[in-house]
Curated annotation (Swiss-Prot):
Name of the protein this chain belongs to: Neuritin
Family membership noted in the UniProt record: Belongs to the neuritin family.
Molecular function terms from GO: identical protein binding
Binding partners and assembly: Component of the outer core of AMPAR complex. AMPAR complex consists of an inner core made of 4 pore-forming GluA/GRIA proteins (GRIA1, GRIA2, GRIA3 and GRIA4) and 4 major auxiliary subunits arranged in a twofold symmetry. One of the two pairs of distinct binding sites is occupied either by CNIH2, CNIH3 or CACNG2, CACNG3. The other harbors CACNG2, CACNG3, CACNG4, CACNG8 or GSG1L. This inner core of AMPAR complex is complemented by outer core constituents binding directly to the GluA/GRIA proteins at sites distinct from the interaction sites of the inner core constituents.
Source organism of this protein record: Mus musculus
GO biological process terms on file: axonogenesis; neuron projection extension; presynaptic modulation of chemical synaptic transmission; regulation of synapse maturation
Topological category with respect to the lipid bilayer: Lipid-anchor; GPI-anchor
Residues lipid-modified (GPI-anchor amidated glycine): 116
Keyword Transcription regulation: no
Length: 142
């Protein structure tokens, strides 16, 4: 049985992880463009979710959301590639730690299996939107 957290705690966890990543990259000093790259990744994910097609069947809904999620992670890794080696490693570590939180309805759970349950789509979307809001609030505070 996994840990069950509400949206507020999930947002806090994601915000802390992103703040930790930003601080690690900021400390490196040679990654001036990484902040722009990372914010572009967040904005692209937000735009994708905002322009989410309506009226799709459940299987297509899950596939579409998971594609956005994987694109976000690929974009982030690409943005961090030009930084010192520690930033990309830190992102990969945060991604693995987030996956291990085992939060019911998370995108890691939804997109981690090829047969994700359609019923968990709405909680996952709300978790994503709350998490993005927290991430953007944290991002703008720096």
């Amino acid at each position: 049985m996994g840990l069950k957290l509400n949206g507020r705690y999930i947002s806090l966890i994601l915000a802390v992880q992103i703040a930790y990543l930003v601080q690690a990259v900021r400390a490196a000093g040679k990654c001036d463009a990484v902040f722009k790259g990372f914010s572009d990744c967040l904005l692209k994910l937000g735009d994708s979710m905002a322009n989410y097609p309506q009226g799709l069947d459940d299987k297509t809904n899950i596939k579409t959301v998971c594609t956005y999620w994987e694109d976000f992670h690929s974009c982030t890794v690409t943005a961090l590639t030009d930084c010192q080696e520690g930033a990309k490693d830190m992102w990969d570590k945060l991604r693995k730690e987030s996956k291990n939180l085992n939060i019911q309805g998370s995108l890691f759970e939804l997109c981690g299996s090829s047969n994700g349950a359609a019923g968990s789509l709405l909680p996952a979307l709300s978790v994503l939107l709350v998490s993005l809001s927290a991430a953007l609030a944290t991002w703008f505070s720096f």
